[in-house]
């Protein structure tokens, strides 16, 4: 996995998404970023969820005191302003992962994007500016369908969808994937693969999932 010294980095973008919370999305994002970093990859982790669980799990105890977050960065893009210096927002975690944090300002994301041209591409515009600095960029998305989720879908190269192995959860995932394909069919971007991760498998669930 590790890139050769001096070689161009892959900049592969992975979106960890589900429109339902409590399915292991944040755990998947933080654990995978740690494992990739442990293998020698240079990894960035973007907390794109207003609940800011990823930010807290990475050791930020007071997210509301952060002066620059992913929301502020995207606001600069919308306003056509110069992006903040990387050192003002990037947090190097104990695991060697570069965290781009979130706080409750992200709850205003949909309002920020209202009446914005090409609103679905704003996250991609930012990620493209850092892509060649990393082997992998992981995005922990919001657990709801909306402009923020669409931004992640368009931005990423691959999706990882944590899902519980129970009937209703699988049916919900199927609906999510149908929505995803509709969005991608109208977007000028392609996701190379979709990955489904079964989480919280119940021993009592004896039904096969096909």
Indicate residue ranges for each PLM-predicted region.
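P-loop NTP-binding core
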Residues: 1-210
